C-alpha cells in the first residue's frame, strides 16, 4: 500500500533569481510584500487541510473523541499556529527555524493520525491518501524554508 507522495514537493518560496535580485536591491527580506502568515502558500495549504480534517472528523465514532478525533484536530491546527508563531519570530533566525521545525513535526504527527484513521476504516483510502499527500507537500515546503531561512528573516537596514 503506497501512502506517501514519494517526494517532498514544494517550492518553498520564490526562485533563486528573484531571491538574488531582491537581496541586491537591499530589501529587508524576500517576503517584504507579505503582511501576514495568512498570505503564505504553506499556511493557506495547512489551514485548508486542517479545515478538511475537521469536517471529516465529525463522522469519526464517538469512542474516538478523546483519542483520534481530538489528536488529529489538534495536530493539524498546530501546523498553522506554529507557522504563525514562526512568522512573528522572523527577527531571530533560531526562533524562526525552531517554530518551523515544530510545525513540520505537527504535520508528521497529523500524517500518523491519518494512517490510523484509514486503517480503522474511518477515512476512505482515497481521501486519506489525498490528505496524507497534502501534508507531505506541506512538510516539503516547511523543509525548504528551514533549509534556507535567510531570505525569510527580517534584517535591519543599516543607514
Predicted regions and their residues:
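Amphipathic alpha-helical assembly/interaction segments
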Residues: 1-159
Amino acid at each position: 500500500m503506497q501512502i506517501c507522495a514519494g517526494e517532498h514537493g514544494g517550492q518553498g518560496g520564490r526562485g533563486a533569481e528573484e531571491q538574488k535580485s531582491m537581496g541586491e536591491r537591499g530589501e529587508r527580506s524576500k517576503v517584504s510584500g507579505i503582511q501576514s502568515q495568512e498570505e503564505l502558500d504553506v499556511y493557506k495549504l495547512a489551514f485548508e487541510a486542517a479545515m478538511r480534517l475537521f469536517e471529516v472528523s465529525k463522522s469519526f465514532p464517538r469512542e474516538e473523541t478523546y483519542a483520534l478525533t481530538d489528536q488529529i484536530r489538534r495536530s493539524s491546527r498546530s501546523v498553522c499556529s506554529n507557522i504563525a508563531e514562526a512568522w512573528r519570530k522572523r527577527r531571530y533566525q533560531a526562533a524562526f527555524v525552531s517554530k518551523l521545525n515544530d510545525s513540520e513535526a505537527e504535520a508528521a504527527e497529523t500524517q500518523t493520525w491519518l494512517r490510523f484513521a484509514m486503517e480503522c476504516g474511518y477515512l476512505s483510502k482515497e481521501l486519506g491518501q489525498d490528505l496524507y499527500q497534502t501534508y507531505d507537500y506541506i512538510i516539503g515546503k516547511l523543509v525548504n524554508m528551514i533549509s534556507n531561512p535567510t531570505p525569510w528573516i527580517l534584517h535591519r537596514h543599516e543607514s
